[in-house]
Amino acid sequence: MVYEMLSPVPVKKRHRPTLVCLNCRRRKTKCDRGKPSCSNCLKLGETCVYSEDTDENASKKVRYEYMDDLGLPEFINMAPKGLHLLSKRSASWFNGLFSDIAICDRDPYLRITNAVIDILRKSASKGIDRSERDTVLQLPNSLKTVTMYNRSEKSEDQLYHQIAREFSALRSAPIPETYVPYEYEFWSKYYPYFVDKIHPLVPVFNLIELKDLLEKFFQRQKDHPGKLNDKVHESTLLMLTYLIINFFLLEFDSHNRLIQDHINIIKKWLVQSKWFQKTTLLQLRVWLVLRFHNWCTYHDNDGNRMNANDGLMGLIMGHCASLGITWQLWTNVDSDECKNIWINALHWDRKLAVLNGNDTFNGRTMRVPELPNDHLVLKFLKCCVDDPTHVNYKLAIEILNKLNFEEQNPMVTWEWKVIVAVTKLQINHGRLNHINEGISAVIASLEDLITLWNEHFIRPLAPVSYSSRIIEISMNKALVLLPAIILRARNPCKQKILQLMDKILTTYFNEFPYYYHVFKRLFKYKLTLNLINREDSLDHMLTILKHENHQVLEKLGITSKDAEMSDDDVIKVWNARFSFTEKVVNLKVEMMCKNYEPNLFSSSYQHALEKLEERHSAKADAIDVTQFLQQVFDSTDFDLFYGMDVGELPKMDSILP
């Protein structure tokens, strides 16, 4: 039987228009057919294309974004010793990837420097009688470490107890009673400044509605003086008036006692309120203003580790979620008022996460016109924070280079330039520790920072109380890692970087002496500069550690428990493991430094290192603390900075036996 090969019947294809967008069709997801963009594409930041919009093959017009070719990834270990959770009696805290402690932990040069500083500092405190309590000064609980020489914990704060009197005076008075500000002065002086300078940086209020609320508040206080009706949020409005007044005082009268009085009243009221249970839109706005205020003030700001307001930020982000102020505002709710609140909340969440190297409170993002860089910031944090031991260096730097804040407020644009520069400095420093090369990138990042510092001190952006804070933070980050650069460098580059560090220290302590966390770093940084300024500073420190704290060297793999090594052998082993051979490039940018008279940094602790090493080398069991402090404070000019006479300070004989 013969079978004929029949040609197949052609199948007629139906050409019907695709109703869903081509992106959803490709992803096989449900599409709501929204125009001009469906909700799925809006969330993902993609551009919708429908087949009915074009005669050509529309699938070719679906837009994709590709990362530039970065070549092979370069992974670095930014946390070779891990990240630590530290505790003391009053608090516990996690040190983020970009914290001062994390910077020091990943650099062997910084670890030995800090270890030697600790030895010298403890040598000075051996003669302190810890059974004798200090009854002279009355510092607040948050500053207990400075109140006595005799505390059981050893702290750097013991050595300059007396000069903290200014900080004691700020808070030693009892908390004042609430009061209503003078209305005419509020409207004529404080409120215009808030509208002109502060509100553009924290635009969470409708100014017309805000003015109406405050006018009604003052009128009710005239009708019923001394009574706060919380049914119409009078306590919240009173708190807002205190913050508005503080913004003006911080800029033009920063030593006014009213600033701290207002802070104490607000703290007391916050504890007594039910804000942890429920909130309103007005209260949430005031919290964001309080978050902004705490950044500006040197009284109760973010503290030494920039984490003092984490609880406040958690409260803000939590109540944003409870009120529906999240990313869904761009898909389901059309409220510009709520969007402004969410944008400002995200600004603080992202900024502090990048500065500390921590996770954000909200880990989602969308590509919306109001926040064009948010997805890049989160991508950078994911690259660095998810696994600090496996950071894609090239990708991290590439993302930082892509950040563009030119369309933002000029202050926000400038601030993020500083944040990006200081973050690059730390990423490049992490690479330097990982592969023991790349110091030119560290120097280039430092030059970018110096340029921004010079701009600030020539023509600071107002409000200065706000712009100064990021300068203080970035200067401290540079000061933390500069000793590692100096110890790696050789003459003449070493001397030039030492001169740079001296200029930064001089500017840092003379421009920001009233931040408590700055003030208490003074003694340590003075010792550090004098120590690394020695010609044989590295050998000198290794010798001290070999005799006094060999555990530090053992953790670095330098010494052995089974065999004693000579001082020269320790130095040879160090050079074999950590010696830096790359040539250090010269700085191309000059740090501008004013001629400060008096100079707080140069005039303090003149003989501190000499006296400490003298006592340490003598291996005395105890030291004369009175004599030591007389040497330390011999030529200080704190009376001009803190409005007090050093001669009137409590005598050591009245504190120590």
UniProtKB/Swiss-Prot annotation:
Keyword flag Cytoplasm: yes
Cellular localization per UniProt: Cytoplasm; Nucleus; Mitochondrion
GO molecular function, one term: DNA-binding transcription factor activity, RNA polymerase II-specific
Major location category of this protein: cytoplasm
Tree of life domain: Eukaryota
Keywords, ordered alphabetically: Cytoplasm, DNA-binding, Metal-binding, Mitochondrion, Nucleus, Repressor, Transcription, Transcription regulation, Zinc
BP-aspect Gene Ontology terms: positive regulation of transcription by RNA polymerase II
DNA-binding region: 21-48
Record-level GO cellular component terms: mitochondrion; nucleus
Family that this chain belongs to: Belongs to the OAF3 family.
Free-text function comment from the UniProt entry: Transcriptional inhibitor with a significantly increased number of target genes in response to oleate.
Name this polypeptide is given: Oleate activated transcription factor 3
Annotated organism of origin: Kluyveromyces lactis (strain ATCC 8585 / CBS 2359 / DSM 70799 / NBRC 1267 / NRRL Y-1140 / WM37)
Lineage: Eukaryota, Fungi, Dikarya, Ascomycota, Saccharomycotina
